[in-house]
């Protein structure tokens, strides 16, 4: 694997949600061989993160197609972060996938992106599309995080603030520690997309990478997800000393190996 990244091109923009809250979504797409790589980022992250860039560089080196984008309210896309919901970001994920992907795709989702990847798989199964799933690579996946990892863990005081004011500013250990909004809409709308209460059919191989020292998504959450997936061709790798980001060189190497194993 080379350490040199391809030259970063300017993003193209597509409009999503024309009939309801239209927003312009920033996308970087490179044509190439299949299976292509489709990146789904995490909550309050963007497509210029370490893992996204490393996968894009690997795709460029191997002549593979690569697509990444920013959800509304993230990175270079339009919109306010506080307006975001799981359904809104899923709509954008499906729109980008449909417009820029063709043939089999290895969908890689980090944290919230893991939830998005599972929801995307469900949407793909509903009707024929130009692109299909070669497999999923889920990095510290956080399905149902708005309910299981946020709401259920919030104190009564925080819950009350969200319910009465509609928002709570959560302190962050990332991005310089700037607090970010957790809205009532995010929590309530997220309940429309919960997955962990039943089996999850994705119709493709799944590779899960989870850090044992992850303070944001406990390793038990990844095990719970694995138990909901079909038993065949699902591999969970526990990186005992890994944190939530899994962005160290050795972590990146494992992620790329998982992508390459699928195809």
Model-derived regions: residue spans:
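N-terminal cap/lid segment of alpha/beta-hydrolase-fold proteins
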Residues: 1-32, 248
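Short beta-strand immediately N-terminal to the catalytic nucleophile in serine-hydrolase-like folds
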Residues: 107-109, 139
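Short beta-strand element of the alpha/beta-hydrolase
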Residues: 34-42
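Conserved alpha/beta-hydrolase
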Residues: 54-78
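Gly/Ala-rich beta-loop-alpha elbow adjacent to hydrolase catalytic centers
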Residues: 109-117
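The serine-hydrolase catalytic nucleophile loop
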Residues: 43-56, 220
């Amino acid at each position: 694997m080379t350490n040199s990244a391809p030259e970063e091109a300017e993003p193209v923009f597509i409009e999503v949600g024309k009939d309801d809250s239209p927003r312009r979504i920033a996308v970087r797409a490179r044509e190439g061989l299949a299976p292509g790589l489709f990146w789904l980022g995490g909550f309050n992250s963007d497509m210029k993160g370490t893992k996204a860039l490393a996968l894009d560089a690997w795709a460029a080196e191997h002549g593979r197609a690569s697509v990444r984008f920013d959800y509304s309210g993230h990175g270079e896309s339009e919109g306010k972060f506080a307006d975001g919901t799981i359904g809104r970001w899923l709509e954008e994920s499906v729109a980008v996938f449909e417009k820029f992907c063709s043939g089999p795709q290895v969908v890689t989702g980090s944290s919230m992106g893991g939830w998005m990847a599972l929801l995307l798989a469900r949407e793909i199964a509903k009707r024929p599309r130009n692109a299909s799933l070669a497999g999923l690579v889920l990095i510290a996946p956080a399905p149902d995080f708005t309910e299981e990892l946020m709401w259920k863990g919030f104190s009564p005081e925080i819950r009350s603030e969200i319910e009465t004011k509609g928002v709570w500013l959560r302190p962050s250990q990332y991005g310089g520690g700037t607090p970010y909004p957790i809205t009532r809409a995010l929590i309530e709308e997220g309940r429309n997309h919960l997955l962990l209460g039943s089996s999850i059919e994705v119709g493709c191989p799944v590779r899960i990478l989870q850090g044992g020292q992850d303070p944001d998504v406990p390793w038990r959450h990844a095990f719970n997800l694995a138990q909901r997936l079909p038993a065949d061709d699902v591999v969970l790798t526990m990186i005992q000393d890994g944190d939530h980001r899994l962005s160290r060189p050795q972590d990146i190497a494992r992620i790329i190996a998982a992508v390459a194993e699928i195809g």
